[in-house]
Every structure is written in C-alpha cells, then in structure tokens.
C-alpha cells in the first residue's frame, strides 16, 4: 500500500520513474493533497492494473482526509475525479454565501465545503483570529454546540450526484 501526495506520484510518471525501479507489490494506491491529473492516474493504472486506487480529499485542519472515492472505472483525459463520500466519522456538506445548505438536488451550483465530525481539530495554535474565522458553529444547527471547519474550497454536485472539487 502507498499513500502519497499527488505531486509525488506525478514526479514518478513525469521522470519515467517506472523505467528505473518499479515496486512489485503495491495493492492499494491512495492519493491526496491536490487534484490528481487523469494523465498521471492512467499511467499508474497501467503499471498496477490490479491495485485499488483511491482519491482522497481533506485539509490538514480535519486531520487530513474526510472523503474517499474508490476508482472503479477508466477516466478520459477530459474528465475529473469525484471527491467521493465522507468517512464514517465525518459529515461533509456545502453552504452557499448565505450559510444555507446546497444539497445534491442542485447540481452544478457551487458551495463551500464544510466538515464536522470527530477529526475536526481545535483550531490554529496561537492564532485565535484565524481559528474564529474557520472553526465556527454550524449555521444549520441551533440546538447544540457543533463546531464545523469551513474549508474555503468550492465544490459542486454533478447531475448524477457525485461531488467534485472546483477551486480554492
């Protein structure tokens, strides 16, 4: 199993690293940190056709990853990888500019991805202003204290309900 930043995996394919040395026993390849270019994903899948490939998403502030997508089909160069679904201990949702929920029933509409759950950190060390801006009470919950992390990342749902990263 290998878990790597996307940039590290891309360096291997860009510099023809498979021609130099190729590990023979990789069965799971998971990547995170940025959007994986399909060209590089396809190169890795050629080298390891029997391996499980998993696209991970999540910022450091929620202990690294909050969604996963198991890649179970070929992707064309013009396609994007979905972000997948949340881990069991996380809730991932989108808010619009007015802090209203943007659900999957509104495909194509951008919203800021927010995360709640057991992996959300307590904030930024010695930076209360930044913490107060990003770690806030869930505006959808007025019944009890529920801190969420506002990632600042914009995402959208496709027509078939898949979640996609748009921009930071």
What are the residue ranges of the model-derived segments?
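Adenylate-forming
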Residues: 1-82, 87-102, 129
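AMP-dependent adenylate-forming
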Residues: 46, 52-55, 70-168
């Amino acid at each position: 199993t290998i878990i790597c930043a996307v940039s590290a995996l891309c360096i291997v394919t860009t510099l023809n690293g498979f021609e130099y040395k190729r590990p023979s026993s990789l069965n799971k390849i998971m990547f995170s940190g940025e959007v994986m270019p399909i060209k590089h994903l396809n190169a890795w899948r050629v080298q390891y056709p029997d391996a499980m490939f998993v696209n991970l998403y999540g910022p450091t502030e929620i202990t690294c990853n909050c969604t996963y997508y198991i890649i179970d089909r070929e992707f064309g160069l013009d396609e994007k990888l979905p972000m997948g679904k949340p881990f069991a201990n996380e809730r991932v949702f989108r808010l619009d500019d007015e802090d209203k929920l943007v659900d999957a029933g509104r495909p194509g509409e951008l919203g800021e991805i927010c995360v709640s759950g057991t992996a959300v950190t307590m904030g930024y060390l010695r930076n209360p202003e930044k913490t107060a801006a990003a770690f806030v009470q869930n505006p959808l919950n007025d019944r009890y204290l529920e801190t969420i992390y506002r990632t600042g990342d914009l995402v959208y749902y496709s027509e078939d309900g898949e979640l996609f990263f748009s921009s930071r």
